A protein has these predicted regions:
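Boundary/activation segment at the start of structured domains
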Residues: 25-143, 333-520
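Active-site-proximal C-terminal subdomain of hydrolase catalytic domains
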Residues: 52, 194-303
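A short, glycine/acidic-enriched catalytic loop
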Residues: 109-124, 139-141, 153-187
Length: 520
């Protein structure tokens, strides 16, 4: 059984999409991409790879050329601005490989080059991006869409508004959510805006749905929705010099349309309603389930629900309070709570929400008929496991005290004392003592050094503690995603009970836009 709201959306979306092929009005998409870092050291190769991957999707999704303004890092400046992984050592000597691990600095070894993104509009700077939005606003027509993709760095809120997070531009110039919203307010109200954002703290930009980015001003005149990698109060995953790792939200989101991730990992079933097209909301559902990151992705409609609906006995939501008075009102109104069997609650969920719930339950090895209260209980247990694992990893981490007790520095000194010729790493490949059978003998002698056992034991223990912490965090994140989805189901179920017709109408319009398709 589908909710009445979902059935309405399923009827409205095809009608809206047909407007572009009816022969009277052909709506166009206009794309604006903001990518890259704030300096060469903050401009990781994964950001470049994300933009190139998106360009590939655009070229395959539109039958005719589409306007696409791209702002990336330092723009067309030929200087090296991109941080990439240094070439790995190709040594075949186990002795040299071990020495490299002992003497090299922790973390990836990097180098720099100029970015290779074609068709750049300008560098990532506030004035240029504002000009680009003004340019688009000057020639769009009613029914067009503006699609904005951000794969950059972001900053947390600095003032009193926790949602006023920012995009960090070249030279560390910020674009705050409220400033960005003021620019969007200049877009004609009959032009819809779809945002896909993957920067840290990007969830704050969900408030672009309000005029000026401020809930006190009411909703914006135009319909705006967004899909965000992370909440407004947490950093996001994904910025790294290693492009072989594409575990970040937008790679999975855009990969849902192409059938593979940025690195070629195949995508499973995404077309949940089997209409032979992938919608934005279906891509989001896939990313929520498939991306193994610390992110808790959300969309604008999730934030809208929390602004206008509430859950019985729940602190979050419109006019929410744990007071006995409000609890009594909630019961009187018949508002649903976070209780009962999940299988019964899921009947009220949209198709995409059910996909997320089923996928996350499978990952957590939980039954579909589990009680919601038990999910909340297990979530708290996993959160505590993560806190303990993180504390343990911190104790064995990179603090000065731990560095002194790891034995690494002592081992380095003992190696140089016994083999002074090893002081220059560039000479290692030329030393016969490190290759062949002589290399095997060197390894035996190195392992007999007094500091080696301390170094190796500490290295193994740190690695195990870190792996345990990462595993515990990912499990906690899966619970957070599941609970977030369940809450959204209940918020949506309660919305018609307490909201005005205008609020319901706007929510329906949001869902319609979120369920639209990418491309022509």
């Amino acid at each position: 059984m589908r909710s009445s709201l979902e059935l309405l959306i399923r009827r409205v979306v095809p009608a809206v999409m047909m407007m572009g092929i009816s022969g009277t009005v052909t709506a166009k998409d206009h794309l604006l991409t903001i990518g890259g870092g704030y300096s060469p050291t903050g401009n990781q190769a994964s950001l470049e790879a994300n933009v190139i991957f998106y360009q590939q999707l655009v070229s395959q999704s539109y039958s005719t050329p589409v306007e696409h303004l791209i702002y990336f890092a330092d723009g067309t400046d030929p200087k090296d601005d991109l941080q990439v992984m240094a070439a790995e050592s190709n040594t075949e000597s186990p002795a040299i490989e071990l020495l490299e691990g002992i003497f090299s600095a922790d973390g990836p070894q990097v180098t720099y080059r100029n970015h290779e993104i074609p068709n750049i509009t300008d560098k990532i700077r506030p004035a240029a991006i504002q000009t680009g939005l003004e340019q688009i606003a000057s020639h769009v027509v009613g029914g067009d869409r503006l699609i904005i993709y951000v794969t950059a760095h972001g900053g947390s809120a600095k003032g009193d508004d926790p949602m006023d997070t920012s995009i960090t531009c070249w030279g560390k110039q910020p674009i705050s959510m409220r400033q960005f919203t003021e620019w969007l307010d200049e877009i004609p109200s009959d032009v819809s805006v779809v945002m896909v954002m993957a920067q840290c703290y990007c969830g704050g930009f969900a408030n672009t749905m309000f005029s000026g980015g401020d809930p006190k001003n009411g909703m914006s005149k135009g319909n705006r929705v967004g899909f965000f990698a992370q909440r407004h109060d947490l950093p996001a995953a994904g910025c790294r010099p290693d492009i072989t790792n594409d575990d970040e939200y937008s790679s999975y989101f855009w990969g849902a349309f192409l059938g593979q991730s940025r690195t070629g990992k195949p995508v499973g079933i995404v077309d949940n309603d089997q209409n032979n097209r992938v919608s934005f909301s279906e891509a989001h559902a896939y990313a929520v389930v498939a991306s193994p990151t610390v992110d808790i992705p959300l969309r604008t409609s999730d934030v809208y629900l929390r602004a206008h609906s509430r859950i019985a006995g729940h602190r979050e939501g419109a006019a929410a309070s744990p007071s006995a008075e409000n609890s009594g009102k909630d019961v009187e109104l018949g508002l649903s709570s976070l209780s009962g069997s999940l299988s019964n609650l899921a009947v009220q969920a949209s198709l995409d929400q059910r996909v997320m719930i089923n996928g996350l339950l499978t990952q957590l090895k939980l039954p579909f008929d589990i009680e919601v209260a038990e999910i909340l209980n297990q979530k708290e247990i996993q959160e505590e496991r993560f806190r303990q694992a993180r504390r343990e990893a911190g104790r064995r981490g990179s603090s000065r005290r731990e560095s002194r007790s790891s034995g690494r520095r002592d081992l380095q000194q003992q190696i140089i004392q016994n083999w002074p010729e090893l002081q220059e790493a560039d000479d290692w490949d030329d030393l016969e003592s490190l290759t062949g059978r002589r290399g095997e003998g060197f390894l035996d002698e190195l392992r007999d050094l007094p500091a080696f056992e301390t170094y190796w034991t500490s290295k193994v223990e740190r690695s195990r503690a870190q792996e345990k912490s990462v595993y515990a965090e990912l499990k906690a994140v899966q619970f957070r995603r599941l609970v977030h989805t369940i809450e959204s189901v209940v918020f949506a179920k309660n919305l018609p009970v307490i909201a005005s017709p205008e609020i319901l109408k706007r929510y329906t319009e949001m869902l319609t836009l979120e369920s639209s398709f990418f491309g022509s």
